Every structure is written in structure tokens, then in C-alpha cells.
């Protein structure tokens, strides 16, 4: 799927704290200044998650989020520098300042908003079951996952959702997507939970050997994730999103 298609589809307790908050914007450097000084936006993504970010036949990173990140960087007057990182370490890399932002279908959740700032959503999708074609009719609702071997990304919202909603499922976690898809294809697991948009892409890429099973179980919105304390960068990203979409 192309970029064009997807783009459619406290009170403070003391005066000293109050004064501190008022003067902070004057003295605190914002990450946006550093990004513009360096000329690059360090972007974290997996690089193995089609159609959002993956390597083409020549080994070049491509996909919707690659195009989006390049457009965002251009709006900021810099270039995007991509840092492929496994999902289970990508937010830690953001926290440790190895990355400026993460653009990797990071679902905006209340729990994550306690730790990170998010842009407005750039995709709206859902949690989707993906099975082998012959088994598609066996999964129509969340309760159908009970007792089945369900593959999910380690530390993802899919894993959390499954634990909360279908604890009877046999949860198998993966730190990379290719292995997860391969295990489904050869029958080591019964079903995987993925982004609904990614599910349709995978069906196409596998020559319809896999199938989207039922409707999405839950709505999810994804946004650009960045460290808290960078209001100028956050505002610039939000403004760029308005122009891009």
C-alpha cells in the first residue's frame, strides 16, 4: 500500500514551582534546536514491518512510515536518519536519547502517555487476527482465541490486550515480525495479532496463503512518540502533520 492510500484511509503547590515553570521555556533547550543544529532527525523504526517500514529488494528502507518520516524531516528543514531497532528495545532507545522520535506504529495509550509525548494520530487501525487461509473461519471474536497458540510482538499493545482480554490464550511472544509470520505459515502457531492494515498487506505478499480472520478486535491510533519536555518539537511535529495530511 502506498503513502497516498494510507494517508486517506497539575495545579502547582508553591509559588517557586510556578515561577520555575514560567521561566523554564526561556532557559531550557528544546530538542528541536538540537535537531536543526545537527541537520538530522534520528528516527527509530523496526524496518521489518510492511507496509509501514521494511526493506525492498535492493535493501533500501521503504514504506508508508519511511515516506512520512522523510516528509516530516523536510518540514522541519532537516533530513531523516533512520535507525532500525527491534521493537523490544526501541522505546528504551528513545529514553536513552539515541533516538529523537519513534515512528513505528506506536499505539497511543494512556499508559504510554505517562512516559512519552505523542503527536496527533497519523494512522487509525485495529487489532486484527491473521491466520492460515484454511483456518480463517475459526476466528470471529476474541473468545475464539482461547486455547489457541497466539503470536504477538514482545512488549506490544497486542500482548497487553491479549493478556487482559483473553488470558486463556497460549501466548507466544516474538521480538521480530518475520519469525512470527513464518511460524504462522508453517503451523507452529495458530494465529497472530497484528495491525489490521499490515494484515491485509501480508495476505497479499503471501499469495493469499494467509487470511484476515473476522473484524478488528479493538481500535488503535498510532502517533509519533518523543521524550517529554520538548514542547517546541512536539508542536512542530503536530504542525507538520496538519500540512502533510
State where each predicted segment sits.
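N-terminal export leaders
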Residues: 7-11
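Extracytoplasmic small-molecule ligand-binding "clamshell" domains
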Residues: 29-105
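Alpha-to-beta junction loops
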Residues: 41-42, 78-79, 96-104, 148-149, ...
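Ligand-binding cleft/hinge of the Venus flytrap
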Residues: 53-57, 69-78, 142, 155-174, ...
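Short helix-initiation/N-cap motifs at beta->coil->alpha
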Residues: 66, 82-92, 137, 172-186, ...
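A ligand-binding cleft/hinge motif common to bilobed small-molecule-binding domains
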Residues: 89, 106-114, 161-164, 185-218
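Periplasmic-binding protein-like
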Residues: 124-131, 196-242
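Flexible hinge/capping segments at coil-to-helix
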Residues: 132-149
Amino acid at each position: 500500500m502506498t503513502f497516498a492510500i494510507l494517508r486517506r484511509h497539575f495545579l502547582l503547590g508553591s509559588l517557586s514551582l510556578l515561577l520555575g515553570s514560567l521561566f523554564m521555556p526561556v532557559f531550557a533547550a528544546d530538542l528541536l534546536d538540537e535537531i536543526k543544529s545537527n541537520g538530522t532527525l534520528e528516527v527509530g523504526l523496526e524496518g521489518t514491518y510492511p507496509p509501514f517500514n521494511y526493506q525492498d529488494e535492493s535493501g533500501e528502507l521503504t514504506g508508508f512510515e519511511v515516506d512520512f518520516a522523510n516528509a516530516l524531516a523536510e518540514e522541519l528543514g532537516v533530513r531523516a536518519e533512520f535507525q532500525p531497532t527491534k521493537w523490544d528495545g526501541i522505546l528504551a532507545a528513545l529514553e536513552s536519547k539515541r533516538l529523537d522520535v519513534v515512528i513505528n506504529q506506536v499505539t497511543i495509550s494512556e499508559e504510554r502517555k505517562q512516559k512519552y509525548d505523542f503527536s496527533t494520530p497519523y494512522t487509525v487501525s485495529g487489532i486484527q487476527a491473521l491466520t492460515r487461509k484454511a483456518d480463517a473461519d475459526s476466528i470471529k471474536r476474541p473468545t475464539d482465541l482461547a486455547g489457541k497458540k497466539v503470536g504477538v510482538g514482545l512488549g506490544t499493545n497486542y500482548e497487553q490486550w491479549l493478556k487482559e482480554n483473553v488470558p486463556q490464550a497460549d501466548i507466544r511472544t516474538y521480538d521480530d515480525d518475520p519469525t512470527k509470520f513464518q511460524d504462522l505459515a508453517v503451523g507452529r502457531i495458530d494465529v497472530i495479532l497484528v495491525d489490521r492494515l499490515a494484515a491485509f498487506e501480508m495476505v497479499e505478499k503471501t499469495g493469499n496463503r494467509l487470511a484476515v480472520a473476522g473484524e478488528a478486535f479493538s481500535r488503535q491510533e498510532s502517533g509519533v512518540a518523543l521524550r517529554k519536555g520538548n514542547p517546541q518539537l512536539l508542536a512542530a511535529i503536530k504542525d507538520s502533520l496538519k500540512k502533510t495530511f
